[in-house]
Amino acid sequence: ERALGDISEAERDYYLERRYPAFGNLTPRDIASRAARTEIEAGRGVGPLKNSVYLDFRDAISRLGRAVIAERYGNLFEMYRDATGEDPYEEPMRIAPGAHFTMGGLWCDFNQMTSVPGLFVGGEAGNNYHGANRLGANSLLSACVDGWFTLPLAIPNYLAGLAGQPLLDVDAPEATEALDDVRGRIDHLVNNPGHTRPATFHRRLGEILYAGCGVSRSEEGLKRALEQVQELREEFWRDVRVTGTDDRLNQELEKAGRVADFLELAELMITDALDRQESCKAHF
């Protein structure tokens, strides 16, 4: 309830240093995220909503100098200052665990092809480099390797092996069925007489996943989240409202399509999490 300046040094709990003295605040990010979540859930959160912890750069600035910190984190500090009106060079930042993106991804072979012949996967959507949880600051590795080296060679090599083979006719039943399915989905989204914008469903889905399928999970929480996602998915298709038409660029329609995919992905993520009984990287 007090301002930061009113909290004495003796009262401040440097919980990472306390829990992991060998690593301190250099603990791996999944461990640091779980520790922050634990502190917040225990009622020790800070800020107006009591849903964050402090990240104090004073020692780093004192040791390395403001110029070095600005070179490394300047853009981040500017975004934080614009969002909060607080200067992270002068006072600690308020941070909390949040969804980044799905880690790991589709199984693929050495040539980046999935179990579906002809379907390739690149970047962090695959599983070849990082496994279930990559190291910090390594996100571009898979994108660069796949984009510059693997896929430009693997895909032409695969296509060369198809030379002379008949392609699927555009009027084949499989193609017609797939096209009709997509058109039907778009038609439903555009003409559905609902009342709720896609962004609202997106936010509610995030809240469900953050609470039940976040950095720390339990069987009870996952089952509750699965039920909530299924209910939200039904509500989405019943009450979503997309403004505009489908005969020109429509960002609301694009967003609705993505939210529909997110709802399906969320259900799969939770189902998979329930099937895994042991901790594994981002699943804890």
Identify the function of each model-found stretch.
Residues 3, 11-103, 116:
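C-terminal catalytic lobe of FAD-dependent flavoproteins
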Residues 2-4, 9-26, 31, 35, ...:
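Glycine- and aromatic-enriched mobile tails/lids
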